[in-house]
Amino acid sequence: MNLISIPAFQDNYIWVLSENNGRCIIVDPGEAAPVLAAIEENQWQPEAILLTHHHQDHVGGVKQLREKFPSIVVYGPAETQDKGVTQVLGDGDRLSILGHDFSIFSTPGHTLGHICYYSEPYLFCGDTMFSGGCGRLFEGTAEQMYQSFMKINALPEETLICCAHEYTLANMKFALSILPDDRDINDYYHKVNELRAKKQKTLPVTLKNERRINLFLRVNDIDLIDKINQETNLQHSVARFAWLRSKKDDF
């Protein structure tokens, strides 16, 4: 399959998996116009829409796409039932689209009903994990988001993280504010800064990369623990994760 990202709004990406014959899967279409333009340009035939959660910038284009393509199947978690979903999915479900198998797992935190879709090597993780960061806790808890991160971290290192926002540069600036002397973080920050200066995308990224530069996956690293302990003494991984999320909220 071919992976394409369609920019939307200020910093969203709408992901599309397409076959050489033009049939395709659309992930989190927050608005219809750029998707319809890409469909026309590439002569795609949409087969399915995958929704990760209920926020408008991820579901806003569903109604218009269903009107244009009445046979399209829309998958999503229970929290998206009023957003045009035709088949509700939950943790542990599996589906096959265009001959490709997808595993669905629950990743609460950003919202309570958030789900991710994994079809090797692609992970469509919505607003759970970003390159260098994690989603805001609008509905869930730090404990829930930490456990969601652990689910993602259990995937193969070559997994491609297809998140829904271009937040990488801001996330790396935050990471540098926490660990300014970390070589991996510095190297990646400079790489990302160069890409964004050229208006190039930083996504997708491998899980292997995230394990090196994403502080939310490194809450048990001694360097980060030492940094946190300069301000407070937190003994548990979840507490350190929550500390990081709070710091990022205020950054």
From Swiss-Prot:
| EC identifiers of the protein | 3.1.2.6
Pathways per UniProt? Secondary metabolite metabolism; methylglyoxal degradation; (R)-lactate from methylglyoxal: step 2/2
- State whether it acts alone or in a complex, and with which partners, per the record: Monomer.
Q: What does this protein do?
A: Thiolesterase that catalyzes the hydrolysis of S-D-lactoyl-glutathione to form glutathione and D-lactic acid.
Please identify the protein, giving its name as recorded: Hydroxyacylglutathione hydrolase
| Catalytic activities | an S-(2-hydroxyacyl)glutathione + H2O = a 2-hydroxy carboxylate + glutathione + H(+)
- Which cofactor is essential here? Zn(2+)
The UniProt gene name for this protein comes to gloB
Free-text remark on how the cofactor is bound: Binds 2 Zn(2+) ions per subunit.
